[in-house]
């Protein structure tokens, strides 16, 4: 029997409301700034009442971008979508096949190869990023979608998660597939892949957001403004030195950048939660 403690309920709800307020208030301020004109957004203190210029600001950045060296924002969104989707598809494909080979194929040093993959989790991004940039430069993949996406497709985390899930599948499945004469890829496509759908959904959401939020990598790889991504592009919209930042346009760009990952999470939230729960069983 669970004891009813009113004070604990009140405390829990109070902390929940405060947490939500702390998270949502900056987003509300950004939304208000996106609805104001240049004069109102620079007023001190800035009003917290939404204005009427939201559509005007969105249209301005959508067509013209922000600043003199900025691409139209629709192009940045397209580049970010291509990058995030390619990284997601590549990570899932490479990680699933790698884990499948490690779990079900018997070849020399397979455990050593797995631990070599796993050890990369212990290396900070800063240790790996500049050698990776040098490799991409030597392969002449700077300022290209291939340079943006290929180095980020390998994932030790995803490989580890798929390996742990595959190890929970009963050996009887493999034996039944062998008796039926199924090839390894037939076994993978007809049995392993359908059983992994909930895990795939969870990993898809996590990986898409990871790819969408990339900042440092596009900043190092891309110099062509037509290949810029939204997250790195927003940083470029902020003026330095004597320049003036159009904060209303920057905040409008930030709101547009939030929409795709939010839509992905809302559409796939049930499958995402189910995938996280199933992976813990």
From Swiss-Prot:
Keyword check for Magnesium: no
One GO cellular component term noted in the UniProt record for this chain: plasma membrane
ABC transmembrane type-1 domain ranges (all copies): 77-268
Matches recorded under PROSITE patterns: ABC_TM1
Key words of the record: Cell inner membrane, Cell membrane, Membrane, Transmembrane, Transmembrane helix, Transport
NCBIfam families: PRK10973.1
Descriptive protein name: sn-glycerol-3-phosphate transport system permease protein UgpE
Pfam family, one: BPD_transp_1
Function field: Part of the ABC transporter complex UgpBAEC involved in sn-glycerol-3-phosphate (G3P) import. Probably responsible for the translocation of the substrate across the membrane.
Compartments, as annotated in UniProt: Cell inner membrane
Membrane topology: Multi-pass membrane protein
Organism expressing this protein natively: Shigella flexneri
BP-aspect Gene Ontology terms: transmembrane transport
Family: Belongs to the binding-protein-dependent transport system permease family. UgpAE subfamily.
Membrane spanning residue stretches: 16-36, 85-105, 113-133, 142-162, 202-222, 247-267
Subunit-level organization: The complex is composed of two ATP-binding proteins (UgpC), two transmembrane proteins (UgpA and UgpE) and a solute-binding protein (UgpB).
